[in-house]
Amino acid sequence: MMLQRCLDLLAPALQEPGAVVVDCTLGLGGHSEALLERFPEARLVALDRDKEALRLSGERLAPYGGRATLVHAVYDELPDVLDRLGVPRVQGVLFDLGVSSMQLDEADRGFAYAQDAPLDMRMDQSTGMSAAEVLNTYPPGELVRILRAYGEEKQAKRIVSAVVREREKEPFTNSARLVELIRAALPQAAKRTGGNPAKRTFQALRIEVNGELSVLERAIPAAVESVAVGGRIAVLSYHSLEDRLVKQVFAAGAANTAPPGLPVVPEQYAPRLKLLTRGAELPTEEEIAENRRAAPARLRGAERIRESLG
């Protein structure tokens, strides 16, 4: 999704032999493969919390040998990963946020509301609470907060009332029952807007289960710090909460923070980042026609223009 634009955005920073680029969201390795192909002198470090994704992408990237280093890690662990690898600074960082197509297409992971599956939704299935556990154990007020904050679901109270009523009869295990419950709970008018009525609830549960926003909140500033001066970072996000967070970090880095009235701006107040996109760039109609999952994508890019001081 918008891969070509991401590569073009990172290109000026990845021409030098030995440049290091980080793919923070490896998935099935499509972006990593494209980075290795496009920048034959670059080395790749790629992260994923999903062990199955690492196995499959490892096979895909095997022809690139020692140029690719794959690491089982969450992307907010980037500073630790680079430290372990002895890489002080990198020249490029790419994030493609959201669920990989593999996770969406694998029925037994429970990410998709279009097919019945166990309510799991963990990107790393070896750790943490599943979506079913969240639904069955969280207090009603907490569930309402999650649906509102992470799903921007206006009918959160109505949905949670139905969930609490149903879970007392029998705990939730599968996605189809939840989808049906949401359909039944929503007023007719709410069902007419924006696709499957379960979409927002599933998004909210996925974000909660994987701690996505809190991880991202730590990951983007950490990625900015790991980029050398002249290095670049590109972020593809898929909903407004992610995009807003990326926008805030980039805008803060690109701001002049000097107190008003100074005749000369000392370096510690000067911007650390230069924005590379005007607002968020959207996918083209062709990209959406080719892959409908690209429709909500938003791309932002920034270049590191000075070191942090003090």
Curated annotation (Swiss-Prot):
Localization in the cell: Cytoplasm
Keyword Lipoprotein: no
Disulfide bond residue pairs: none
GO MF term list: rRNA (cytosine-N4-)-methyltransferase activity
Record keywords, A-Z: Cytoplasm, Methyltransferase, rRNA processing, S-adenosyl-L-methionine, Transferase
Protein residues bound to S-adenosyl-L-methionine: G29, G30, H31, D48, Y75, D96, Q103
SUPFAM superfamilies (UniProt xref): Putative methyltransferase TM0872, insert domain, S-adenosyl-L-methionine-dependent methyltransferases
A GO biological process held by the record: rRNA base methylation
GO-annotated cellular components: cytoplasm
InterPro entries named in the record: RsmH, SAM-dep_MeTrfase_MraW_recog, SAM-dependent_MTases_sf
One Pfam family hit: Methyltransf_5
Keyword S-adenosyl-L-methionine carried by entry: yes
Highest taxon of the lineage: Bacteria
Catalytic activity: cytidine(1402) in 16S rRNA + S-adenosyl-L-methionine = N(4)-methylcytidine(1402) in 16S rRNA + S-adenosyl-L-homocysteine + H(+)
Chief location bin: cytoplasm
EC number(s) reported in the record: 2.1.1.199
Similarity comment: family membership: Belongs to the methyltransferase superfamily. RsmH family.
Chain's role: Specifically methylates the N4 position of cytidine in position 1402 (C1402) of 16S rRNA.
Protein name per the record: Ribosomal RNA small subunit methyltransferase H
Organism: Streptomyces coelicolor (strain ATCC BAA-471 / A3(2) / M145)
